[in-house]
Regions:
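Flexible loop/turn segments at secondary-structure boundaries
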Residues: 245-247, 285-288, 336
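Long, compositionally biased
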Residues: 295-330
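Charged substrate- and nucleic-acid-binding regions of tRNA-handling and nucleotidyl-transfer enzymes
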Residues: 317-355
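Structured, contiguous alpha/beta core segments that scaffold functional sites
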Residues: 1-257, 261-263, 267, 339-355
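Short acidic alpha-helical/loop segments enriched in Asp/Glu that coordinate divalent cations
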Residues: 236-239, 276-287, 316-320
Length: 355
């Protein structure tokens, strides 16, 4: 009879895990991938597009090397280490140049970038990644524009994804879409004004009647046509006391708002943290000496924070065994690659003075 008197076991309740992985089904569904309307709007500004491309070209061309830290008796020394397979091909579907450049792009505009671990080796460490566009990521536990640490509640395309399989790059510089709205909005409105002015046909001369019987519209049109016809045959004109000739003082620099556009380009260079001269903005008498020095300026003032962010994130314990790390071979970019061009390039300041 015990079979009829035993109490049924209560149903087990399964708590929804914050790191659910339903979002992984959206990975590589490129039909749904987006880069964000704000980013697309920002990239319409030529100065910002130039700054972005310059910095992306640096990060995209740098090779990654692996090292191990060892004590040599005086200090910690970085000793070259045999690279893991993914260093040569981070994502098997694309080149390192591509994934690193677009990782930087996410850091620049959104302040964060994300890779998803698609494969792991037998020791549990990642061996292949794919990039998740930052515009498709939502952090449920961090809703502000400033990151406070790695998130454990990540949505990809609206679906939860396991944070343990997501490598989170957190930029030390706040994303442009959060800091540059006003400057970009001004630049776009200025560009719209310049476009309108470029389409307007301003007359070179205005004939204004200042006395006598008012002329009809047809008579005014005939007088203007006669004036234009006379200019084809002679540079001299004669008018009576009832007509005033007013030359148009509008010049191309005023019509196209050259000074305003130049100033706004400097503002965008400041926003992107790149030296203004690298984005072809006039800055008075300042000029660089060689392409090598320009490369150093671009690295020091613009690229270095993002390079450090990427290489330190990829050296973390969730990517590599403790004691090993990866870094960009920046010396080959700063010294070897541009050594010949630095020696052969003439002094830019002398060229300007001799022009």
């Amino acid at each position: 009879m015990g079979i009829f008197t035993s109490k049924p076991e209560p149903a087990k309740t399964v708590k929804a895990a914050a790191g659910g992985n339903a979002g992984a089904t959206q990975i590589n569904n490129f039909y749904a991938y987006v880069e964000g309307d704000q980013r697309a709007r920002f990239m319409q500004v030529p100065t910002l597009s130039r700054a972005r491309d310059l910095m992306a070209s640096v990060i995209g061309c740098l090779p990654l090397v692996m090292f191990k830290e060892m004590w040599n008796g005086d200090e910690m020394e970085k000793v070259p280490e045999a690279p893991r397979s993914w260093l040569r091909r981070i994502d098997k579907g694309v080149t390192n140049n591509f994934i690193l450049s677009w990782t930087f792009d996410d850091l620049l505009f959104y302040g964060s970038a994300y890779w998803f671990v698609t494969e792991r080796s037998s020791d549990g460490y990642p061996m292949n990644f794919t990039r998740l566009p930052a515009a498709m990521i939502t952090l449920q536990d961090q809703q502000s524009a400033v990151r406070f640490g790695p998130s454990k509640q990540i949505l990809f395309n609206g679906l939860p994804i396991d944070y343990k399989d997501v490598i989170q790059f957190m930029s030390p510089v706040q994303g442009l879409i959060y800091t540059g709205y006003t400057s970009i909005n001004t630049a776009l409105k200025l560009e719209q004004a310049r476009n309108r002015n470029s389409l307007s046909t301003m007359p070179a001369t205005t004939l204004r009647q200042v006395g006598g019987e008012p002329m009809s519209a047809q008579e005014l049109s005939d007088m203007a046509a006669a004036y234009d016809h006379a200019r084809l045959n002679s540079a001299t004109c004669a008018v009576n006391e009832f007509v005033e000739v007013i030359p148009n003082t509008a010049t191309p620099d005023k019509m196209l708002l050259i000074d305003a556009a130049e100033y706004q380009s400097k503002e965008i260079a400041r926003l992107a943290n790149v030296p203004a001269y690298l984005v072809s903005v006039s800055i008075g008498n300042y000029s660089y000496v060689s392409s090598s020095e320009a490369s150093r300026d671009l690295y020091t003032f613009g690229v270095k924070p993002y390079i450090d962010c990427i290489q330190e994130t990829l050296s973390a314990d969730n990517v590599l065994p403790r004691g090993t790390g990866v870094m960009f071979d920046i010396e080959s970019y700063l010294e070897n690659q541009y050594q010949d061009s630095a020696e052969n390039m003439p002094d830019m300041a002398n060229e300007v003075n001799n022009a």
